[in-house]
A protein has these predicted regions:
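Short alpha-helical segments enriched in small residues
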Residues: 1-86
Length: 86
């Protein structure tokens, strides 16, 4: 895995721990890579809550509430869909 990605993930985890926060992620094209990268860090059960991989457009709509209209107009790989996934 890319060293820069691992470094950024470790930095995020330090901030989560310092703030006493937990994280939930929603992914699509990355296919779970973000969740995998984060949970590879020791102690993940202390700050990692859950993850969704909604690769299919139907899953984005059903699970995350992404607007079908936005998917049709902008496409799955768009800033608008990413914002709705968040």
């Amino acid at each position: 895995m890319d060293v820069e990605i691992q470094t950024d993930a470790a930095r995020l985890v330090r901030r989560l721990r310092q703030a006493g926060l937990r994280i939930t992620v929603a992914e699509s094209c990355t296919g779970g890579l973000l969740a995998s990268t984060l949970t590879d860090i020791a102690g993940a059960s202390d700050w990692f809550d859950q993850s969704w991989v909604t690769y299919a457009n139907d899953a984005k709509t059903r699970v995350l509430g992404v607007s079908p209209d936005t998917l049709d107009r902008k496409g799955a790989v768009s800033a608008e869909v990413a914002i709705q996934m968040a």
